[in-house]
Curated annotation (Swiss-Prot):
It catalyses: (2E)-4-hydroxy-3-methylbut-2-enyl diphosphate + oxidized [flavodoxin] + H2O + 2 H(+) = 2-C-methyl-D-erythritol 2,4-cyclic diphosphate + reduced [flavodoxin]. Pathway: Isoprenoid biosynthesis; isopentenyl diphosphate biosynthesis via DXP pathway; isopentenyl diphosphate from 1-deoxy-D-xylulose 5-phosphate: step 5/6. Its EC number is 1.17.7.3. The lineage of its organism: Bacteria, Pseudomonadati, Pseudomonadota, Gammaproteobacteria, Enterobacterales. The gene is ispG. This is 4-hydroxy-3-methylbut-2-en-1-yl diphosphate synthase (flavodoxin). Transmembrane segments: none annotated. Its cofactor is [4Fe-4S] cluster. It comes from Yersinia pestis. GO terms for biological process: isopentenyl diphosphate biosynthetic process, methylerythritol 4-phosphate pathway; terpenoid biosynthetic process. GO terms for molecular function: 4 iron, 4 sulfur cluster binding; 4-hydroxy-3-methylbut-2-en-1-yl diphosphate synthase activity (ferredoxin); 4-hydroxy-3-methylbut-2-enyl-diphosphate synthase activity (flavodoxin); iron ion binding. Converts 2C-methyl-D-erythritol 2,4-cyclodiphosphate (ME-2,4cPP) into 1-hydroxy-2-methyl-2-(E)-butenyl 4-diphosphate.
């Protein structure tokens, strides 16, 4: 029930990764990357499908060898989500996966080779109508740039990016996005800020090698949160040493927190104290697991007492305010006569949330149909 985001997004050009629009006001796409052996086709396809179930928009797949490229052909045939091929060192792999229907090529200027090789990749991308991501990384800058700056700096990452943007510009190829990732939050943020002032192409955001599930999520939330709040960013990936499914969940949580893109339940829950009248933590944990399948955006407040409960419930789709034995229930900010038994809270809340999601989905379908009729 909160209003939309106050963030004014940076203007950028539009490209498509598969059928997913990127830039020019399109919803910020959430990306992840498989961490299976690409030559293990079954395992890779299974992971891609798991990512699809939690809402991933785009999946990147590492293609380190020609054997992996052959495996990619089979993976692509079994996938419905757009796939990006991650290419390092051997530009010929990019040419091969283009034949097999890849939706985007990610090349690393630090190791892809000289300009003649880039020209071949661009020519191939043009022939197959495939966009490119110029993926700069603070850990793999070109040797001459490393020597010039001594260490990764925002200016170094910018120079690497602009060098290759200029190449694509000279080749009259504009179907590309750019990233300037680093594992240090300040280095990444300042690199993206510099780049955003130089080009109007879409930007892919990420704090690379951010760490494990907890620390990596925190770093990514800080770094990407800063950039997104400034309107910078068109796609993102949360790079975690964890199950890639967690990357997608964290990515959507960041977008949801900034009210940029809503998907699923936004839980508002108190940290609890001795005033709580029911098990808030257990209730929230159980509902997060039970309601993972819901994609309908809604705010659900679960507050253990009457200090902040009524106020949060007023701006929530569904709200619960703790009281002795039976807690107050709110819908669309209005207190209902019905009360929840504190001992049966989880089942009752789940039923109410699912019922509300069905109503909201039905209303959305009506609106969409009316818009289609008016076209």
């Amino acid at each position: 029930m909160h209003n939309g985001s106050p963030i004014i997004r940076r203007k950028s050009t539009r490209i498509y990764v598969g059928k997913v629009p990127i830039g020019d006001g399109a919803p910020i796409a959430v990306q992840s990357m498989t961490n299976t052996k690409t030559t293990d086709v079954d395992a890779t396809v299974a992971q891609i499908k798991a990512l699809e179930r939690v809402g991933v928009d785009i999946v990147r797949v590492s293609i380190p060898t020609m054997d992996a490229a052959e495996a990619f052909k089979l993976i692509k045939q079994q996938s419905t989500v757009p796939l990006v091929a991650d290419i390092h060192f051997d530009y010929r792999i990019a040419l091969k996966v283009a034949e097999y229907g890849v939706d985007c090529l990610r090349i690393n200027p630090g190791n892809i080779g000289n300009e003649s090789r880039i020209r071949e990749v661009v020519a191939c991308a043009r022939d197959y109508n495939i966009p490119i991501r110029i993926g700069i990384n603070g850990g793999s800058l070109e040797k001459d740039i490393q020597e010039k700056y001594g260490e990764p700096t925002p200016e170094a990452l910018l120079e690497s990016a602009m060098r290759h943007v200029d190449i694509l510009d000279r080749l009259n190829f504009d179907q590309f996005k750019v990233s300037v990732k680093a594992s240090d939050v300040f280095l990444a943020v300042n690199s993206y800020r510099l780049l955003a002032k130089q080009i109007n192409n879409p930007l892919h955001l990420g704090i690379t090698e951010a760490g494990g599930a907890r620390s990596g999520s925190v770093k990514s939330a800080i770094g990407l949160g800063l950039l997104l709040s400034e309107g910078i960013g068109d796609t993102l990936r949360i790079s975690l040493a964890a199950d890639p499914v967690e990357e997608v969940k964290v990515g959507f949580d960041i977008l949801k927190s900034l009210r940029i893109r809503a998907r699923g339940i936004n839980f508002i829950a108190c940290p609890t104290c001795s005033r709580q009248e029911f098990d808030v933590i257990g209730t929230v944990n159980a509902l997060e697991q039970r309601l993972e399948d819901l994609i309908t955006p809604m705010d659900v407040s679960i507050i253990g007492c009457v200090v902040n409960g009524p106020g949060e419930a007023l701006v929530s789709t569904i709200g619960v305010t703790g009281a002795r034995n039976h807690s107050g229930f709110y819908e669309d900010g209005v207190r209902q006569k019905e009360r929840f038994d504190n001992k049966a809270m989880i089942d009752q809340l789940e039923a109410k949330i699912r019922a509300k999601a069905s109503i909201l989905d039905a209303n959305n379908r009506i609106v969409i149909n009316q818009l289609d009729d008016n076209k």
